[in-house]
Amino acid sequence: MKVILREDFINLGKEGDIVDVKDGFARNYLLPKGFAVFSNKHNIDIFSQKKRAILKRQESRRKMAVELKEKLDKVNLEFIMQSNDSGKLFHSINSSNIADELLKLGFEIERRKIDMHHGALKAFGTYNVIIKLYEGISSVITVEIKREEKKNSLKKSKSVKKEV
């Protein structure tokens, strides 16, 4: 089924592109969510009239992506995590955790733009995570997972004495 994209869609195309997708993907996802419209004569005419505005918008997005890339390339995220005695993390770091930390630093990044090519981060160490900002523009941030320092004092069980 041919559809016209109403906004940029990663791995599919840019706003205004006519793309051929599977019927189920179009009917169940793209069309109901408003990411695309049917490719018919009427919609093609509308998008051809809007082409100049679309190109201008894409150029401004590209400029913003380049500026954002320069700022993000300097970002290093550090997560202090708890682990068991053998060193296994109690929970992993995923794209949502990274997006939340970036939001705290003032960067509003959609979690679908964060490429976790390692999968979820499940061990201590330093990782490079790619953030896809725009077509052909991506940033690499460093994510470091450190062990939470355990307190030197052992937890002593306190016994309560009952007086008779």
UniProtKB/Swiss-Prot annotation:
Pfam families: Ribosomal_L9_C, Ribosomal_L9_N. The keyword RNA-binding applies. GO terms for cellular component: ribonucleoprotein complex; ribosome. InterPro entries: Ribosomal_bL9, Ribosomal_bL9/RNase_H1_N, Ribosomal_bL9_bac/chp, Ribosomal_bL9_C, Ribosomal_bL9_C_sf, Ribosomal_bL9_N, Ribosomal_bL9_N_sf. Keywords: Ribonucleoprotein, Ribosomal protein, RNA-binding, rRNA-binding. One of its GO terms (biological process) is translation. One of its GO terms (molecular function) is structural constituent of ribosome. It comes from the Bacteria. The keyword Ribosomal protein applies. Binds to the 23S rRNA. Belongs to the bacterial ribosomal protein bL9 family. This is Large ribosomal subunit protein bL9. The gene is rplI.
